């Protein structure tokens, strides 16, 4: 059992955001290429598609489609810098998804503690 199971859910996990709101984030992150793009964008500043495809065998078109899925989920956004289009990570939706996972973890811990109490009674 986790030590957090005896505590009430963290403030951020008290159903502030409906769990359904995080589903598009989890769906977008369910692809290895998109997960890699998020990792790259989290580690640095805004990047162009050319920078994101550098050293990979992924086409510019494929990366553009993956970035659009991530943008639709609210995980990245594009920024115009002159004629160049840069992409950057948007942490807010990831934070919401983390809070959803915290809520689920708390619910499971709470349910397991109740089961343990019944079994030991």
Give a label for each model feature.
Residues 54, 65, 71-72:
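Alpha-helical residues within the helix-turn-helix
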Residues 1-21, 39-43, 94-121:
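Amphipathic alpha-helical dimerization/coiled-coil segments
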Residues 17-59, 84-95, 99:
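N-terminal helix-turn-helix DNA-binding core of bacterial DNA-binding proteins
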Residues 27, 36-39, 71, 77, ...:
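A cross-family signal for key residues in well-ordered alpha-helices
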Residues 72-82, 86-88:
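Beta-hairpin "wing" of winged helix-turn-helix
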Residues 48, 59, 71, 76-77:
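Short beta-strand(s) of the beta-wing in winged-helix/HTH DNA-binding folds
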Residues 62:
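Recognition helix of helix-turn-helix DNA-binding domains
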């Amino acid at each position: 059992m986790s030590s957090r199971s005896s505590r009430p859910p963290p403030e951020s996990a008290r159903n502030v955001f409906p769990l359904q709101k995080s589903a598009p984030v989890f769906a977008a992150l369910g692809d290895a290429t998109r997960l890699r793009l998020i990792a790259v964008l989290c580690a640095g500043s805004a990047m162009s598609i050319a920078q994101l495809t550098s050293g990979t065998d992924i086409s510019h078109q494929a990366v553009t489609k993956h970035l659009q899925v991530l943008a639709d989920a609210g995980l990245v956004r594009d920024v115009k810098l002159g004629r160049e289009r840069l992409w950057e990570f948007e942490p807010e939706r990831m934070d919401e998804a983390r809070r959803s996972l915290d809520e689920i973890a708390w619910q499971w811990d709470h349910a397991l503690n109740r089961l343990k109490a019944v079994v030991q009674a």
